[in-house]
Amino acid sequence: IMGMVKAKAGPVTLLIMVVCAVIYFLQMFGFGDGVFALLHFPAFEGQQWQLWRWVSHALLHFSVTHIVFNLLWWWQLGGDIERRLSSGKLLQIFLISAALSGAGQFYVEGANFGGLSGVVYALLGYLWILGYRCPHLGLTLPKPIIGFMLVWLVLGYVQPFMAIANTAHLVGLLSGMAIALFDSGKQKYQQTS
């Protein structure tokens, strides 16, 4: 299994997976409150200058299902980006989308959230737009995957009983799309010059 995981993932993909797993195990083995207090989105006066908080909330997960699904999508989508483009590009998308999706979620519902799903939706948005505008890069997503993820996004908004960071998902998707629009425009400009 590790060979398969490593074959698809670069160092950033693997590092984020390992960090998420370590943090999850710390949370499960009695350090949950301390870990959350250290890593949650900046909610209190002065925390906005603790810059790690703008992205570290994406490393928190609150159930086995939560972390497994997020890490599988991260590995699948992030691994493709890192292998085809670069580790720097994946890190850029992670940092920008974690900060923006976290800010959106905080603005709407406060700081009681965590998880990689806002970033996962950014990866989806990035691959969707980049695959459409620059198919020669080989980063196209199958339409059923895009459809499934968009339906899942909508379902998050229409069911009131589960704690889902819907705003983080939406802002993540939009931030990934925006980065892809910028990158694809730059790609097309470089091809014409």
Where is each model-derived feature located?
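A detector for small-residue-rich transmembrane helices and their helix-helix packing motifs
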Residues: I1-S193
